[in-house]
Each structure stands twice: as C-alpha cells, then as structure tokens.
C-alpha cells in the first residue's frame, strides 16, 4: 500500500470516522427511542 496521502485525508480515516459517526447516531437514536425520547425525532 503506497503512501499517497499528499495533503489529503486518507480514505481509511474518512471511512473510520464516518462509520463511528453513523454508529454513534444509531446508538443515540435507539437509546432515545428506548427511553421514550426517540419519538420526537
């Protein structure tokens, strides 16, 4: 795997951050719906 990160954000970093953000939003949504606040979303 060549080092092609010349002034750009690496693709794996974007994927990791995007995946963590999506998981975080899903966790918050499911937790809110479990508690009873998710219905307002």
From Swiss-Prot:
Keywords: Chloroplast, Membrane, Photosynthesis, Photosystem II, Plastid, Reaction center, Thylakoid, Transmembrane, Transmembrane helix. InterPro entries: PSII_PsbJ, PSII_PsbJ_sf. The chain crosses the membrane at residues 9-29. GO terms for cellular component: chloroplast thylakoid membrane; photosystem II reaction center. One of its GO terms (biological process) is photosynthesis. Its main location: plastid. It is a single-pass membrane protein. It is found in: Plastid, Chloroplast thylakoid membrane. Pfam families: PsbJ. Belongs to the PsbJ family. PSII is composed of 1 copy each of membrane proteins PsbA, PsbB, PsbC, PsbD, PsbE, PsbF, PsbH, PsbI, PsbJ, PsbK, PsbL, PsbM, PsbT, PsbX, PsbY, PsbZ, Psb30/Ycf12, at least 3 peripheral proteins of the oxygen-evolving complex and a large number of cofactors. It forms dimeric complexes. One of the components of the core complex of photosystem II (PSII). PSII is a light-driven water:plastoquinone oxidoreductase that uses light energy to abstract electrons from H(2)O, generating O(2) and a proton gradient subsequently used for ATP formation. It consists of a core antenna complex that captures photons, and an electron transfer chain that converts photonic excitation into a charge separation. This is Photosystem II reaction center protein J. It comes from Ostreococcus tauri.
